[in-house]
Amino acid sequence: MTGANRHYVLAAGGTGGHLLPAFALAAELDRRGHHVALITDERGAKIPGKPDFLPAHVIPAGRFGKNPLRWVGGLRAVWKGREMAKRLFESFQPSAVVGFGGYPALPAMLAASREDIPSIIHEQNAVLGRVNRLQAGRVSAIATAYPEIQRLKPKHAEKIHLVGNPVRAGVLSLRDEPFPPFTEDGLLKVLVTGGSQGASVLSQIVPDGLAMLPPALRQRLQVTQQCRPEDLDTVRERYKTHDIPAELGSYFEDMAARLADAHLFIGRAGASTIAELTAVGRPAILVPLPIATDDHQAHNTREVVKAGGARMIRQEKFTPKELAKQIQALGQRPDTLATAAHAAWNCGRPKAVEDLADLVESFGGADMMDVIKVGGNNARAASQGVAVGQGAAKERAE
C-alpha cells in the first residue's frame, strides 16, 4: 500500500515485549516513506534494537499498585505525560497514533483521544493487557496477534483485526530455511533461553532433565543455553558433570541463526518468542512464566500447542523427570520433530508487520483504499472465544 508521506507516532511500554513489535512497525512505515516517532519511558529508550532513524521521546508514565498513595503519584505522572504528548502532536501532526501496551503508552493514547487523532492498539498477547483494555473503547482499531483474545469485550468485535506479531527482519529471512536434518543417530540440537533476562528455573531444571534421557539419546545432545550471568558457572558445572556438551552465554547476538539451526527449543512463552518460533517453524517445549499478568503466557501457547507445534509444561510441574519425558517423546523418532516443526511453521504470520502497516495507513489519509485485506483474507480475531464476522478496516479521513 502506498500513499503520501505521513507522520505516525508509536507508543510502547518500556520492555522488549512491547517495543520490539513497535520497532518492526517503525521500520516498515519508514520503508514506505513515512515519518515515525516513538513515545516511551526511560527504560524503553534503552532497549536494544531501536532503528537509528527513530527518535525516542521520553515522557513520564505512572505506575499503579495496591497502595493508594502510588495511585496519586501515578495519575499525576499520566497527566503530565499526556500534556507532553499533546505538545509533541501539535508539532509533529501525526495521522494516527499506535499503542503497543504498557503503562508508558497510556499518556500518548489518552492525548490522541483528547485531540481526536485516529488511534490503534496492538495486543501482542492472547490476553488483552491492562492499558489496552482501558483504551479498547476509545481507539479506532484493535490489532491482535492471536485468533482468540481473552479480556476483550464482544462489543469491540468490529474493531478487531488479526495481524499477528511483527518479528525482526533477520528472523523472517530464515522462514524458508528447512528444518535441520535429524536422523536416528545424528545430533539433537537443543536451544534453551529464558527471555531477555534469562530464567533461573531453566538453569536449574534443564541440565538435570537432559541428563535423565536414555543414554542413546543423551549422547547425541548438543545444547546452547542462555543463562543469567550469575548462573553461568553453576550451569556449566552441571553440564560438565553430566558429560553433555553445552555452549552457554548470557547473550547471543546471532540468536535467530541459532534458532534456525535448532531441532528443539525450550523456554518461556512470551509473545515475541512464540512469534519467532512460528516464523521459523521450530518445535518447542514452553514453560509459561507463572507470574505473568492474567496468565497471558499460558494463553499464548494455546494456538501452537493445539496445532501440534509445541508442548506446554506449567512451571509447578516443570521437573527434570517431566522434561525428560517430553523430550524423549519428541526425539525418539526423526519424523516426530519434523512434523511438529511443520505445525509450528503453519502457525506463523510472516506478513504481520505488513498487515499492521496496512491497517495503520488506512487511517488519516484520503488517498487510502476504502478497504484493506489484512492477511489477504480479511482476517478477524475472536474476542473471548466469540467468533467475529469477516471484515476490514474502513478508511478514516483526516
Swiss-Prot record:
GO cellular component: plasma membrane
Alphabetical UniProt keywords: Cell cycle, Cell division, Cell inner membrane, Cell membrane, Cell shape, Cell wall biogenesis/degradation, Glycosyltransferase, Membrane, Peptidoglycan synthesis, Transferase
EC number: 2.4.1.227
Gene Ontology terms describing biological process: carbohydrate metabolic process; cell division; cell wall organization; lipid glycosylation; peptidoglycan biosynthetic process; regulation of cell shape
Glycosyltransferase listed as a keyword: yes
Region forming the signal peptide: none
Reactions this protein catalyses: di-trans,octa-cis-undecaprenyl diphospho-N-acetyl-alpha-D-muramoyl-L-alanyl-D-glutamyl-meso-2,6-diaminopimeloyl-D-alanyl-D-alanine + UDP-N-acetyl-alpha-D-glucosamine = di-trans,octa-cis-undecaprenyl diphospho-[N-acetyl-alpha-D-glucosaminyl-(1->4)]-N-acetyl-alpha-D-muramoyl-L-alanyl-D-glutamyl-meso-2,6-diaminopimeloyl-D-alanyl-D-alanine + UDP + H(+)
Chain positions recorded as UDP-N-acetyl-alpha-D-glucosamine binding sites: T15, G16, G17, N125, R168, S196, Q297
A GO MF label: UDP-N-acetyl-D-glucosamine:N-acetylmuramoyl-L-alanyl-D-glutamyl-meso-2,6-diaminopimelyl-D-alanyl-D-alanine-diphosphoundecaprenol 4-beta-N-acetylglucosaminlytransferase activity
Name of the top EC class for this enzyme: transferase
Gene3D superfamilies: Glycogen Phosphorylase B
Location in or out of the cell: Cell inner membrane
Superkingdom, taxonomy of origin: Bacteria
PANTHER family: GLYCOSYLTRANSFERASE, UDP-N-ACETYLGLUCOSAMINE--N-ACETYLMURAMYL-(PENTAPEPTIDE) PYROPHOSPHORYL-UNDECAPRENOL N-ACETYLGLUCOSAMINE TRANSFERASE 1
NCBIfam families for this protein: murG
Family label: Belongs to the glycosyltransferase 28 family. MurG subfamily.
The protein's name: UDP-N-acetylglucosamine--N-acetylmuramyl-(pentapeptide) pyrophosphoryl-undecaprenol N-acetylglucosamine transferase
Taxonomic source organism: Erythrobacter litoralis (strain HTCC2594)
Lineage: Bacteria, Pseudomonadati, Pseudomonadota, Alphaproteobacteria, Sphingomonadales
Gene: murG
